[in-house]
Curated annotation (Swiss-Prot):
Organism in which the protein naturally occurs: Streptococcus pyogenes serotype M1
Function: Involved in DNA repair and RecF pathway recombination.
Protein's recorded name: DNA repair protein RecO
Lineage, top ranks: Bacteria, Bacillati, Bacillota, Bacilli, Lactobacillales
Keywords, comma-separated and alphabetical: DNA damage, DNA recombination, DNA repair
GO biological process: DNA recombination; double-strand break repair
Family listed: Belongs to the RecO family.
GO cellular component: bacterial nucleoid
Source organism superkingdom: Bacteria
């Protein structure tokens, strides 16, 4: 059992026996790991095992069983996110997506950095819906999905109107619409934004502002992509869907 130090983000915890907990932490150096916390009611760790807690952890990794947290420091609990039910719902969904996208014990420092930066920007007050859309699009490759929103799948032109084709898992230009009579008939702005989301940098995020109509169209199409290509529906996403139904009442 080796001693390791790493930044980590708590994904979730669950009960284990009467007074113990299992805590899954996404670590920067060792991927997602499950940790055993004994006697949680008397443990100093009771305050840092909640989801959306980030800290520097020292832990013992066990290759064959449960691992153990030895110590922690520099704890951040994303207070702004936790004080807003909508922001919290989207942040929880992003956590769940990261958890679903890679296997446990598999190091992925790039995804860790992307997740942390997404949460940091949500905490700063940036648009959590747009941040979530960008996270959803850029994480598709972790599910083995590669979609082309940039150029026509047939002629590679980018200067004509484009529409998405499930048949080609890519966009078609107007001269090749006939190749798929069941193309999506998407708003051109949706195609443009998805192409931009695939390669956008964090510095660019601060300049994006979208109206409600475009946000709704993005949400509907990304939901369609996840249904058709990824095939998962997370509980945290269902909670968001329910929130949207009565969101105007709460805002």
């Amino acid at each position: 059992m080796q001693l390791t130090e790493s930044l980590g983000i708590v994904l979730f915890n669950r009960n284990y026996r009467e007074d113990d907990k299992l805590v899954k932490i996404f670590t920067e150096v060792a991927g997602k790991q499950m940790f055993f916390v004994k006697h949680i009611s008397r443990s100093k760790m009771s305050s840092i095992i909640q989801p959306l807690t980030i800290a520097d952890f020292i832990f013992k990794l066990n290759d064959t069983g449960l691992s153990y947290v030895v110590d922690y420091s520099n704890v951040n609990t994303y207070r702004y996110i936790n004080n807003d039910i909508f922001r919290l719902a989207y942040a929880s969904y992003v956590l769940a997506l990261a958890d679903a996208a890679i296997a446990d014990n598999e190091s992925d420092s790039h995804l860790f950095t992307f997740l942390k930066k997404t949460l940091d920007l949500m905490e700063e007050g940036l648009d959590y819906e747009i941040l979530t859309n960008i996270f959803e699009i850029q994480i598709l490759d972790r599910f083995g999905i590669s979609l082309n929103f940039h150029e026509c799948a047939i002629c590679h032109r980018t200067d004509l109107p484009l529409d998405f084709s499930h048949r080609f898992s890519a966009v078609l230009c107007s001269e090749h619409y006939y190749k798929d009579n069941r193309r999506n008939h998407l708003d051109p702005n949706v195609i443009y934004l998805l192409s931009r989301f695939q390669k956008i940098t964090f510095d660019d995020l601060r300049t994006i502002s979208l109206n409600k109509d475009i946000k709704k169209k993005l949400r509907q199409f990304i939901d369609e992509l996840y249904h058709d290509y990824v095939g998962i529906k997370l509980k945290s996403k269902t909670f968001i869907d329910n929130l949207v139904k009565w969101g105007d009442i709460m805002k």
